[in-house]
C-alpha cells in the first residue's frame, strides 16, 4: 500500500475536515495522471511531491477549521503549484523535486489584497512566507463585502 493510500487518498471515506477532504480529492486526481497527460513529454507528479504538498498544507493549516483547501495545479514538468485565490490575498507556491536535497526547490509569489503589496521568495524564505500567508488567505470570509 502506498503512503497516499494510507492517508485515505485511495477514495475511502474518512472523518476529515472539509478542507482536508477537498485537498485529498485533488491529490487523488493528480495521482492518476499518466505520462503525456499534458502533451508529449509531460510527466506525472510523483507521489513524493504530492506527499510534500499535503505536508506543507497540513502544517500551515494545523488547528484551523474554517478554511478553504488550496488548489493543487500540476506542471507538465512534474512540478506542483499550491495556490489560493481569495478575498484576502493570493498565493502561488511552487514545489518540485529537482533540487540538490530531499526538499527539492520551492518558490512563492503572493499578493496581500488589503495592502496591495506583493511578495516573493525562494527556498527557506518561500517556506516561511507560505507558513505565514497560507492561514491568512485560506480563511473563509463570510462577509462578501470585505474590502480589498
Each predicted region: which residue ranges?
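Short beta-strand micro-motifs enriched in acidic
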Residues: 73-77, 85, 94-98
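Short, mixed charged/polar active-site loops
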Residues: 90-92, 118
Amino acid at each position: 500500500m502506498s503512503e497516499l493510500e494510507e492517508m485515505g487518498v485511495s477514495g475511502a471515506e474518512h472523518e476529515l475536515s472539509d478542507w482536508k477532504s477537498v485537498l485529498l480529492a485533488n491529490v487523488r486526481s493528480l495521482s492518476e495522471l499518466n505520462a503525456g497527460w499534458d502533451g508529449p513529454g509531460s510527466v506525472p507528479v510523483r507521489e513524493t511531491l504530492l506527499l510534500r504538498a499535503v505536508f506543507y498544507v497540513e502544517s500551515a493549516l494545523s488547528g484551523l477549521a474554517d478554511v478553504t483547501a488550496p488548489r493543487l495545479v500540476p506542471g507538465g514538468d512534474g512540478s506542483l503549484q499550491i495556490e489560493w485565490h481569495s478575498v484576502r490575498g493570493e498565493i502561488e507556491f511552487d514545489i518540485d523535486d529537482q533540487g540538490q536535497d530531499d526538499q527539492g526547490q520551492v518558490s512563492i509569489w503572493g499578493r496581500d489584497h488589503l495592502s496591495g503589496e506583493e511578495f516573493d521568495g525562494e527556498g527557506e524564505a518561500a517556506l516561511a512566507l507560505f507558513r505565514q500567508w497560507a492561514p491568512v488567505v485560506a480563511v473563509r470570509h463570510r462577509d462578501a463585502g470585505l474590502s480589498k
